[in-house]
């Protein structure tokens, strides 16, 4: 039950934040550089909220192993679905740019509101730990998701297109980009590199781009 899940999350928060102090120096340094105008008390409040969010995310993610499609859809509200379904039909696919926020993993339920023959594509970075990598692939494919490792994104999307498949391509776009393909700009007072893969794929495939805004209530 979700009530038990969030009780466990509260315990996990205490262990992670108070006992283990997981990456606390890194988080505090980032908050100080991003919000120098805020007081120590204000930054501390943000810090604690972040760790509570992180703990909830971890437990909610594991819950996906056993949630039904009905349970997932009951806890997710999708907006502008008519528009992206219409453009998927018209162009053969769209790009959805997704942030690391509000349990983005639950977006795997999008497959339930798409046409059965269309493909929800998830581009991911393979994890070094093979067990965790297989676990996350299992979670992300439960509701028809098609997992593509980032190093073969273009090749796999072109193959799907040639096979006559229409698709929604989900990309986590707020990660630090590897290699030389990146765009630099000032973000939260710091020079920050952004991925440009979504733009490249959109231009190559002539896919419209959606920016996904997530919120948690």
Where are these regions (language model features)?
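Membrane-anchoring hydrophobic helices of lipid-metabolizing enzymes
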Residues: 1-98, 103, 133-138, 144
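Soluble catalytic domains of membrane acyltransferases
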Residues: 65-217
């Amino acid at each position: 039950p979700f009530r038990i899940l969030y009780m466990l999350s509260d315990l996990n928060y205490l262990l992670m934040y108070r006992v283990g102090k997981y990456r606390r120096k890194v988080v505090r340094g980032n908050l100080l550089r991003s919000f120098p105008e805020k007081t120590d008390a204000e930054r501390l409040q943000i810090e604690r909220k972040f760790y509570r969010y992180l703990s909830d995310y971890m437990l909610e993610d594991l819950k996906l192993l056993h949630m039904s499609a009905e349970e997932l859809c009951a806890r997710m509200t999708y907006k502008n679905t008519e528009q992206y379904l219409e453009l998927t039909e018209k162009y053969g696919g769209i790009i959805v740019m997704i942030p690391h926020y509000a349990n983005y993993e639950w977006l795997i339920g999008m497959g339930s509101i798409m046409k059965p023959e269309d493909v929800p594509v998830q581009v991911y970075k393979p994890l070094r730990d093979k067990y965790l990598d297989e676990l996350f692939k299992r979670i992300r494919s439960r509701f028809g998701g098609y997992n593509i490792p980032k190093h073969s994104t273009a090749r796999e999307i072109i193959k799907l297109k040639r096979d006559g498949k229409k698709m929604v391509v989900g990309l986590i776009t707020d990660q630090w980009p590897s290699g030389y393909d990146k765009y630099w700009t000032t973000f939260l007072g710091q020079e920050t590199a952004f991925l440009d893969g979504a733009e490249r794929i959109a231009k190559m495939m002539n896919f419209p781009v959606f920016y996904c805004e997530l919120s948690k209530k």
